[in-house]
Amino acid sequence: GQDRILLDCGMFQGRRNEAAEKNRVFPFDPRLVTNMVLSHAHIDHSGRIPLLTRRDFAGRIISTRATADACAYLLPDSAYIQQSDAAYLNYKTARTALGEIRKSKKAKKISNRGMEGIKKSLKKGHKLDTEAIDALIDRHHLKGVDPLYTMEDAREALTYFDDYPYRHPITVGNGVTCTLYEAGHILGSAITIVRAKEKGRAISRPALGVFT
């Protein structure tokens, strides 16, 4: 079969609902991607890698060592932000639902002190109690928000990285190689020269990140 090489896998950044919808959908099947080449660590170029690997991508992620090292911090941090954001949105949903319950006939069975106790149960000190929030959302069949990926997903994605020096030809497919050259964008960023044979002819194509 034909090899498919993915150049970057970035996160769309914009308004929450629009970004969430775009980021969850790939215009390709991750299982069909042979390998991926990452130009640099910025989230708009690397941010969906944990989603890619969670959806059964089975190849390797090629980058410079500096880019791989940066992703070891940026991807878990991205996951933490998404998990925190989802928890806060679910907390707001739960609080709103409790407000509606308070106005309903069912509220007559719950004292004000009891209702305040339920609200307080959604937090542990100054932190949100995600288990209590999720349980309330499930109990009342509310629409919750899931993070795009978790910190566990991000840590797992880091095991897919293979780092290489600049100007070193790397085999990324059958008859396909890539070479990383200094891009001068951020530390570790690279322009990728992909070399392959097409209809018996050798071709070379430069790229500084493509898929976002």
Locate each region found by the language model.
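His/Asp/Glu-rich metal-coordinating catalytic cores
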Residues: 1-37, 53-212
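Conserved G/P- and acidic residue-centered "switch" motifs that form tight phosphate/ATP-binding loops
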Residues: 40
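N-terminal Rossmann-fold NAD(P) dinucleotide-binding loop
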Residues: 45
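A short acidic, amphipathic alpha-helical/loop segment
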Residues: 48-52
